[in-house]
Amino acid sequence: MRQAWRWFGPEAGVPLDAVRQAGATDIVSALHEVPIGQEWTSAQIVERKNLIESTPTGRHPLTWSVVESIPVSDDIKRSGKAARHDIGAWIASMEALARNDIKVICYNFMPVVDWCRTDLDYITSTGATAMRFDQDRFAAFDLHILRRKGAEKDYSEEDRIAARAIFEAMDETEIEQLIVNIASALPGSTTEPLTIPAFRKKLETYASIDAAHLRRNLVEFLEAVTPVADSLGVKLTLHPDDPPRSLFGLPRIASTEADYAAIFAAVPAQSNGMCFCTGSLGVRADNDLPAIARRFASRIHFSHLRATTREGDGRTFHEAAHLEGDVDMVGILRILLEEDRKRDAGQTIIFRSDHGHRMMDDLEKKVTPGYPVIGRMRGLAELRGIITALDACALEYDPNV
């Protein structure tokens, strides 16, 4: 398994030497500046690749191994008028990446919003901050700030009472911050920052699309791109929904083991794989992560390793330290290592410590939400320690011992 680091480019303020010092050898990056639906050119890719892989004397090399992501446009997700054009541009971008030996591509198929949190700086018991999703605050936003048409039917009477109480206790600053947290694009998002009216309008474009319809559109997309990916040796890794349930009445189709089984059955191409994100899938108590990892091990080409802690009835959660929370990280790494040992050298599983707590000096710095340097470095070191121990001892790990 190879250790990777998500790097948002030179403007993000994280020097590549910091990546080396964290212990990573591989880079996960993307051309975020290219508009959605527009082809990535070889020249653009080479420029970014050279920036990453030009190694100063005495430094260990870094390799741009994974793209996260080539955004999938809303027209593709809705099978809209521009879908054919956008799929063509997506394929052309994939071909350009393959020509430059970048052959793992992460993407998602979540409509409108990629990942959603109500709090980007929830204070933990250590004083570090983490991202958090509060179900009642989310409902307050949906019902009383966004005022989505038909939202009431998605919430119980108890939910609606709690949401109103929260909304009525909020001042204007808190309301504005909640809007920023939920309605603005976050790292990895395929959307632009949205105003409330624009957000409502975008949601309305999915009004006639249910989960079955969205899944058909995903299958149509995969049937177009996987033959080319197979011919190029490219691995496509579908990221799970985050959180793995419906938000804003929108359909979700990559939330459970059954969802992925249906996708792989519909398009069994070798290139059709998954990004095994333990944080996203782990939010649901009914997702057995070790079982999912074992069932789909041969299709896991990229992994996001992080943990979440469910609160109350499980709909509220916060991002835990990497070895804490509700994720059996040791058991999962054991399964991934077993799979990795079966593979040829060029097919190893690439993973990154996903997200991290904002701590120490990062508390005083402007950081990309979810991606502070120190918290991710801590997470990567902890994961590396587990891998080193499992490799050295060849443990038959039993989580019940």
Curated annotation (Swiss-Prot):
GO terms classed as biological process: D-glucuronate catabolic process
GO molecular function terms noted in the UniProt entry: ferrous iron binding; manganese ion binding; mannonate dehydratase activity
Family from the record: Belongs to the mannonate dehydratase family.
Listed name of the protein: Mannonate dehydratase
Underlying gene: uxuA
Disulphide linkage map: none
Pfam families reported for this sequence: UxuA (PF03786)
Annotated organism of origin: Brucella melitensis biotype 2 (strain ATCC 23457)
Main enzyme class: lyase
EC number in record: 4.2.1.8
Reported function: Catalyzes the dehydration of D-mannonate.
Keyword entries, A-Z: Iron, Lyase, Manganese
